């Protein structure tokens, strides 16, 4: 299970090369190379779960509006994770290794501190069918399922854990 992730809310114009490189180093490189190095230890029935994000699939409804984060580089890193999941699942499936991801929406963590403002919380809740901010346990429960025998026929998937965002 790889849960590498940092975020930087910034417009396209405001991102620096350093921001971009740091996001990709943390969000893409840091899960890629440990998995590569550990592959010899993975046998049939092993599972790899990466953490993607709702940001890889949707854009904010009103970019630039107060409370709406702009995350183009972060979203690109999480899109890269979703691509890795598909490629790794195809390559490692022959060895009986499953590879999946979870794609959390807004989860109450330090990374979603924008929800601490009324505007940010309103933005987050406006996207979700279930009308609450997700909890870390919501994501952990899906990860536990993905590594269980109950998910033995699932590989190459990215499971949204987002309260029905953008339905």
PLM regions and their residue ranges:
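Substrate-binding pocket helix/loop in short-chain dehydrogenase/reductase
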Residues: 11-12, 16-24, 62, 70, ...
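Amphipathic alpha-helical dimer-interface segment in Rossmann-like NAD(P)H-dependent oxidoreductases
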Residues: 26-46, 56, 89-90, 94, ...
């Amino acid at each position: 299970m790889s849960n590498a992730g940092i975020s930087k809310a910034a417009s396209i114009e405001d991102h620096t090369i350093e921001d971009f490189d740091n996001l990709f180093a943390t969000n893409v490189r840091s899960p890629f190379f440990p998995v590569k190095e550990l592959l010899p230890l993975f046998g049939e029935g092993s599972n790899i779960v990466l953490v993607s994000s709702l940001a890889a699939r949707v854009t904010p409804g009103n970019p630039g509006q107060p409370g709406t984060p702009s995350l183009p580089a972060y979203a690109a890193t999480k899109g890269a994770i979703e691509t890795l999941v598909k490629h790794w699942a195809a390559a490692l499936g022959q060895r009986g290794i499953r590879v999946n991801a979870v794609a959390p929406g807004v989860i109450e963590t330090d990374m979603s501190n924008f929800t601490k403002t009324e505007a940010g919380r309103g933005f987050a809740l406006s996207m979700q069918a279930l009308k609450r901010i997700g909890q870390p346990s919501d994501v952990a429960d899906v990860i536990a399922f993905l590594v269980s025998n109950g998910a033995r026929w699932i590989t190459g998937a990215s499971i949204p854990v987002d309260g029905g965002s953008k339905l």
